[in-house]
Amino acid sequence: MATFHYHYDPLDRLIQTAGIQRFYNQSRMTTEIKGTQRYSVFQQDGRLLAQQRRDRTKDECHLLGTDLQQSVLHAVGADKHHSMAYNAYGHRPVENGLISLLGFNGERADPVTGHYLLGNGYRAFNPVLMRFNSPDSWSPFGRGGINSYGYCGGEPINRVDRNGHFFGLVSLINILKLSLLRNLRTSFQMC
């Protein structure tokens, strides 16, 4: 039976597992290194933009297409377009491909278990069982909610859980920002 070790930094963020090192900018993962391969994710204002993969022989860049919850739906490279799909709780069949480092809700799936380690590794969410593997330390009477194993109060379409403690609504502010940007672009193009 294989044994895997998970290592955390002083801020309780997952930084190393099974030969993989992770680096963060604030609370979001920016780079992952495994052997000679290095993946870097580029973001702006919380929006995923692109991913770069580098190793000794070549560099690959992919532009990422996401939904409002930051789930990566498309990765467009120089020579190929990849599409990804998930069920409501983030499960993605293996044959669906893993071209992007990040996936459902912009989170990294653990390469060993396929679970999403939310809160930078605080708690593992199992998309097949549609629940967390361990209870929330803030439940049942805190902000974690009554069901200490539940994910997003049973409503993963309109809610997102970034830290493994409690969920929030998909930001109405982000929707308004996108609408405002579209209107500004249209107004600017008319000038």
What are the language-model segments listed below?
Residues M1, Q16-I20, T31-T36, A50-R56, ...:
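Beta-turn initiation residues at beta-strand->coil junctions
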Residues M1-Y6, T17-Y24, T36-F42, K58-L64, ...:
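A structural detector for short beta-strand units
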Residues A2, Y8-T17, N25-T31, Q44-Q51, ...:
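A short glycine-rich beta-turn/N-cap micro-motif
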Residues A2-F4, K80-S83, N87-Y89, R123, ...:
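Short turn/helix-capping motifs enriched in Asx and small/polar residues
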Residues T57, P111-H115, F141-R143:
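Short glycine/serine/proline-enriched coil/turn segments at secondary-structure junctions
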Residues C61-G121, V128:
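A motif-centric feature for acidic-aromatic and gly/ser/thr-rich catalytic loops and repeats
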Residues L180-M190:
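Cationic, amphipathic, low-complexity alpha-helical segments enriched
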